[in-house]
């Protein structure tokens, strides 16, 4: 989809760092520590990960395993204490805050449990908001196309409050897709939905990957949701502890039960290698 850019230099026009071709997300030795001394908390303990473009990855783990911190560091919402993060080949760890903000607006899509739609804006305006914030032309045809993809034709002039929870999450997915981002980060996107509606939303994310070539990284606690992904990576104590490829909800639930019981299921080095380019 061609978009006219503003005169301001956008993050996706920056020269790319030397990342591995074909990768959407790369984390190298990422650590995140909160506090100092005896009271320090190591939320991430040296995470290495490489996720190819056009894949759907779910991240699971027990409470306190580092899932939220992983997503925040990978998406540029939090800065690692050590290590590097690349999105679409661009090193983001050392970017200044304003450049990082512009990069998120132009090259990352977000889908949250709480939808995060602005109630005073129409559905169309909510979908176009990332383009507006990024200083790009707000083409109403792009909004119509994105809404059609998620099955919301004819809803452009509605307000979020006039829609069901499932429809609001569809709007959030359309908003995430409108900039054709390098990666979509989804944080518990079905947590507030009933089972049937959750399946519809997950089907849209799956379609975005399989048919549109999007890359999705989803944090979830639900094995049934994770089963929609190509692979499920498990975090424990701030490090990857195992993975399941094309697993059923039952297989994923069994692995989660083992983690919750404190069983390590595999070394991080193996997870990082298999989750890379060869995946």
List each model region and its residues.
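ABC family nucleotide-binding domain
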Residues: 22-229, 235, 240
């Amino acid at each position: 989809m061609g978009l006219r850019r503003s005169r301001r230099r956008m993050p996706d026009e920056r020269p790319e760092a030397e990342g591995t071709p074909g990768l959407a997300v790369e984390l190298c030795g990422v650590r995140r520590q909160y506090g100092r001394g005896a009271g320090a908390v190591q939320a991430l303990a040296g995470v290495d990960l490489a996720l190819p473009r056009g894949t759907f990855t779910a991240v699971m783990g027990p409470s306190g395993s580092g899932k939220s911190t992983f997503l925040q560091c990978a998406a540029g919402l939090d800065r690692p204490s050590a290590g590097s993060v690349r999105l679409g080949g661009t090193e983001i760890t050392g970017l200044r805050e304003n450049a990082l903000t512009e990069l998120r607006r132009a090259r990352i899509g977000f889908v949250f449990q709480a939808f995060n739609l602005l109630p005073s804006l129409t559905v169309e305006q909510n979908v176009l908001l990332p383009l507006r914030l990024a200083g790009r032309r707000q083409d109403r045809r792009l909004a119509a196309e994105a809404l059609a993809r998620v099955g919301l034709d004819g809803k452009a002039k509605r307000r979020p409050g006039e829609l069901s929870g499932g429809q609001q999450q569809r709007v959030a997915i359309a908003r995430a897709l409108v900039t054709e981002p390098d990666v979509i980060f989804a944080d518990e996107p079905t947590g507030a939905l009933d089972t049937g509606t959750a399946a519809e939303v997950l089907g849209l994310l799956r379609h975005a990957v399989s048919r549109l070539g999007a890359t999705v990284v989803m944090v979830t606690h639900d094995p049934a949701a994770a089963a929609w992904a190509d692979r499920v990576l498990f975090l424990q104590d701030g490090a990857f502890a195992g993975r399941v490829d094309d697993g059923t909800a039952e297989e994923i639930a069994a692995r989660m039960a083992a983690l919750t019981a404190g069983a390590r299921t595999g070394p991080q080095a193996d997870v990082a290698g298999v989750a890379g380019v060869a995946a």
